[in-house]
Amino acid sequence: MSDGSVILGEISGRKVTRIAPDGSKTEIGKAGGGPNGVATGPDGALYVCNNGGAVYQTSPSFLSTGPGPDYKGGSIQRIDPKTGETRVLYSECNGHKLSAPNDIVFDSEGGFYFTDLGKRYANQRDHGGLYYALPDGSKVVELVYPMLTPNGVGLSPDERTVYVADTESSRLFAFDIVEPGKIKHEPFPAPYGGRCVCGLPGFQRFDSLAVEASGNICIATLIAGCITVISPEGEVVRQVKVPDVYPTNICFGGPDLRIAYITLSASGQLGAMEWPEPGLRLNFMV
């Protein structure tokens, strides 16, 4: 934010929080459920991907997630940052319930792309997908469905490409945008009708992402405990280590957008570090 604060979703805390430069915290609105990705819209309101709530269980070798005890489905919420008024914009698309909305990005036209990660149960899982919606609650469309575990979403600087990072496959997919809310679907065997930009070897898992002004895609990478920077051509430019095995998101701030704010979820902290390249300024960033 322009005042140096950062707004983020606390899934386990079931709230949206503003963190001031001095580290003080203030809850905004009453999100409930499991607020995840947050973005500022053209009206200055906060738009929240709410996964409906999640339970995290840790074993010696794996961190698993499942629906919370009061889970009733996911939604896209709108929160007025001044009054705290919170309301649900979308909880389904064409009669199909949203499962666990995860990440969100606005285009310059005022609409937004968002991912639905899906939900893991004991012996089955809901599929995820990529969607596009308008902030007035009038329209939501399904762009890609089903996907395995679509997580981070971002736009190229020219807004001709939408990127989706898939968690379990640790692959970055790209889809060509024909017009706002409409993507080009390539025939089989194109993955999900798009293209696979890059995949990582070994056991690494992608989470949310941000885009640099150069067009490189910066993806929070679980297990490896780093931010993976990938060029639009698919080259792994660098991996920047962070002091946490579960970095889940990254955004850029500061006067020249060279400060990277990174959520460190294993330790429950927000970290900040100087970044070698400026980030891409988000639409409607305030």
PLM features: residue spans?
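Sequence-structural signature of mature extracellular/luminal beta-sheet repeat domains
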Residues: 1-286
